[in-house]
Amino acid sequence: MTTKLEQLRKLTTVVADTGDIEAIAKYTPEDATTNPSLILKAAEITEYAPLIDASIEYAKAQSNDKAQQVQDTCDMLAVNIGKEILKVVPGRISTEVDARLSYDTEGSVAKARQLIKMYNDAGITNDRILIKLASTWEGIRAAEILEKEGINCNLTLLFSFAQARACAEAGVYLISPFVGRIMDWYKAKEGRDFEPSEDPGVVSVTGIYNYYKEHGYNTVVMGASFRNIGEILELAGCDRLTISPNLLQELEEATGEVVEKLVDTNGNKARPAAMTHAEFLWDHNQDAMAVEKLAEGIRNFAVDQGKLEAMIAAKL
C-alpha cells in the first residue's frame, strides 16, 4: 500500500517547513519555507558554518559599521540558506522579513526589495522566491505594493478570518494560516484535546479555503504550523501544506487511505467591498485568540532574530 505522504502529494502540494537542507532532500517537497526561528536553528548546524562565513565576508565588504554588518550578515545568511534549498526543491523558497518591521509598511517593502536584490544578484529569479510578511494591516499593505512590482508574498502568522479576507482583497500570492498554534490556544483555554475534525485550527483553515474558492480568489492557501498528522490529513486537498520534517517522517511511515477533505468549488459569488483599516482592526480584535497569537508570534520571531544577531555579532 502507498504511504499517506504519497497519497497526500496527489491531493495537495507538499512543502517542507525547515531550513535543514538534508531533511528537505530526504522528502523531496515542491517548496520550502523558512522563518527567523528556523534560520537560527539552521545556523547552529555545523555544516552551515561556510554559509555564515560567506555571509560575514559579504557584510564586511558592504560596510564598516558593526551594526550594519550584523544586519547584512543576517539577510545574506537567510538568502544563502535559501539558495542551497533551491538546489534541492523545484519550486520556491519563502524568506521572511525581519519581524520587527511587522508594523512598518515602508520598512517591510524596503527589506523585501533588498532580499530580492540579493537573490537576483545570485542569479535567482523572482518566480522562485516568496517574501514572508506578518499578516498585520501594515504587512498586508506592504505585500500589496510588492505584488504590483512582481514580488510574490507569503503572508504568515495568520490566525483570524479578518486577516485572511484582507490578504485576498490585497491580491497577495499566498497565505499561511496557522493550524497548530490556534489549537494550542483553545487547548490551553478549554483544557482538553480535540479530534482532528473538530480541531479549531483545522476548522479555521477549512473556512478560509472555502471562502476563497467560493468567491474566486486566486490567493493560494497553505496550511501551516501542524501539531500532528491528524490535522494535516483533515486538510488533504488544501492548495499547499507546509510540514515539518518530523511530521513528514510520520506521514511517510503511515499507511491507510487519505481522503480528499477540501475541494475547490470554482465559485464566483459576489465579493464584498474591500475592508477598511478600521473594519479590519475591529473584526480582528473580536477574535481574542488571533490577537494574542499574532502578537506572540511577532514577539517570538523577533526574539529569535535577536539571538541570531547576537550569534553573528560574536563572530564579527
Curated annotation (Swiss-Prot):
<dbReference type="Pfam" id="PF00923">
    <property type="entry name" value="TAL_FSA"/>
</dbReference>
<dbReference type="InterPro" id="IPR018225">
    <property type="entry name" value="Transaldolase_AS"/>
</dbReference>
<keyword id="KW-0570">Pentose shunt</keyword>
<dbReference type="InterPro" id="IPR001585">
    <property type="entry name" value="TAL/FSA"/>
</dbReference>
<feature type="active site" description="Schiff-base intermediate with substrate">
    <location>
        <position position="132"/>
    </location>
</feature>
<protein>
    <recommendedName>
        <fullName>Transaldolase</fullName>
        <ecNumber>2.2.1.2</ecNumber>
    </recommendedName>
</protein>
<keyword id="KW-0704">Schiff base</keyword>
<comment type="pathway">
    <text>Carbohydrate degradation; pentose phosphate pathway; D-glyceraldehyde 3-phosphate and beta-D-fructose 6-phosphate from D-ribose 5-phosphate and D-xylulose 5-phosphate (non-oxidative stage): step 2/3.</text>
</comment>
<dbReference type="GO" id="GO:0006098">
    <property type="term" value="P:pentose-phosphate shunt"/>
</dbReference>
<dbReference type="InterPro" id="IPR013785">
    <property type="entry name" value="Aldolase_TIM"/>
</dbReference>
<comment type="function">
    <text>Transaldolase is important for the balance of metabolites in the pentose-phosphate pathway.</text>
</comment>
<dbReference type="GO" id="GO:0004801">
    <property type="term" value="F:transaldolase activity"/>
</dbReference>
<keyword id="KW-0808">Transferase</keyword>
<comment type="similarity">
    <text>Belongs to the transaldolase family. Type 1 subfamily.</text>
</comment>
<keyword id="KW-0963">Cytoplasm</keyword>
<dbReference type="GO" id="GO:0005975">
    <property type="term" value="P:carbohydrate metabolic process"/>
</dbReference>
<dbReference type="GO" id="GO:0005829">
    <property type="term" value="C:cytosol"/>
</dbReference>
<comment type="subunit">
    <text>Homodimer.</text>
</comment>
<dbReference type="InterPro" id="IPR004730">
    <property type="entry name" value="Transaldolase_1"/>
</dbReference>
